[in-house]
Amino acid sequence: MPVNGARRSDERMFMTAIDFSDVSKTYGDKAVVSALSFRVSPGECFGLLGPNGAGKSTIARMILGMTAPDAGKITVLGVPVPAQARLARKGIGVVPQFDNLEPEFTVRENLLVYSRYFGMNTRKVEAVMSSLLEFARLESKVNARVSELSGGMKRRLTLARALINDPQLLVMDEPTTGLDPHARHLIWERLRSLLTRGKTIILTTHFMEEAERLCDRLCVLEGGRSIAEGRPHDLIDELIGCEVIEIYGGDPHELESLVGPYADRIEISGETLFCYVSDPEQVRVRLRQRAGLRILQRPPNLEDVFLRLTGREMEK
């Protein structure tokens, strides 16, 4: 179930906002997406989580009808895509991975120009512009050129632009890549407010914290395939379920023989030993015998889920 209770009446007509059924896409001899199936409910934030090259951006392009699948069926807002992609896009707002704002236009001019893709007249755009700029916290920048904005401001303007047509569905491709932590948290706060208003969001990301904070459900991708799907905390509980101790500064294989008998499970990634334990104190007692180690004890997270599923850490 979505984290929010609000639902727009026009969204209730669709049992699913997005339906992928056995979708595949190949470029040359490389399978980018392989027999992928998932459904996104209206009012839900659904995440596509995976490293670069996992197929996330290709999936986003297929949702928009910009890339045709080689096999399978895609339905978006009740219509088949790409066959009726133009109709579907009337109800979609897009936040691309890289900003494509007009740098020499002002904030106001960027919104006006983009609105013309939806046949909106200037009077209608002016009527909603102040609320969009307030939402994006850009009221004081309405006449500033895009080239004068910070990276975080540009991303917030791109988000405001995506909302110009009051879409039912937002497709967001790596929306906080390249932002500093403060700017990233501000975008997350804005997205949570959209969910409380009943918007549907599909989000591609490789940020584990972003997926945990925003997504009702997510699909973990590797090599264009789904390797897990579910609620973030359900995946963490089912696949990990215990405390994690990260150990640095020694030979991980030697450390494994030292603490392995007291761990539920051990994973090694590079120079780091990940020790999954129900009783952390027993492991910490053994580690005190070794000088020069750096030790971090923490709750499990989606990074641990990915490591458990693939045997490696998420590549940024």
Curated annotation (Swiss-Prot):
- A single GO cellular-component term on record: plasma membrane
* Domain annotation ABC transporter: ranges: 18-248
Q: Could you tell me which SUPFAM superfamilies the record lists for this protein?
A: P-loop containing nucleoside triphosphate hydrolases
Note the topology in the membrane: Peripheral membrane protein
What are the alphabetically sorted keywords of the record?
ATP-binding, Cell inner membrane, Cell membrane, Membrane, Nodulation, Nucleotide-binding, Plasmid, Translocase, Transport
List where in the cell it is found. Cell inner membrane
Transmembrane feature ranges: none
Superkingdom of the source species: Bacteria
Alphabetized GO MF terms: ATP binding; ATP hydrolysis activity; transmembrane transporter activity
PROSITE patterns cross-referenced by the UniProt entry:
ABC_TRANSPORTER_1 (PS00211), ABC_TRANSPORTER_2 (PS50893), NODI (PS51240)
Listed EC numbers: 7.6.2.-
Q: Which Pfam families match?
A: ABC_tran
Keyword Membrane belongs to the record: yes
Which of the seven top EC classes does this enzyme belong to? translocase
What residues does ATP bind to?
Answer: 50-57
Asked if the Swiss-Prot or TrEMBL record annotates the protein with the keyword Metal-binding, the reply is: no
Q: Which InterPro entries match?
A: AAA+_ATPase, ABC_transporter-like_ATP-bd, ABC_transporter-like_CS, ABC_transporter_ATP-binding, ABC_transptNodI, P-loop_NTPase
Purpose of the protein = Part of the ABC transporter complex NodIJ involved in the export of the nodulation factors (Nod factors), the bacterial signal molecules that induce symbiosis and subsequent nodulation induction. Nod factors are LCO (lipo-chitin oligosaccharide), a modified beta-1,4-linked N-acetylglucosamine oligosaccharide. This subunit is responsible for energy coupling to the transport system.
UniProt lists the family membership as follows: Belongs to the ABC transporter superfamily. Lipooligosaccharide exporter (TC 3.A.1.102) family.
Quaternary structure note? The complex is composed of two ATP-binding proteins (NodI) and two transmembrane proteins (NodJ).
Name this protein carries in UniProt: Nod factor export ATP-binding protein I
* Source organism: Rhizobium etli (strain ATCC 51251 / DSM 11541 / JCM 21823 / NBRC 15573 / CFN 42)
State which gene encodes it: nodI
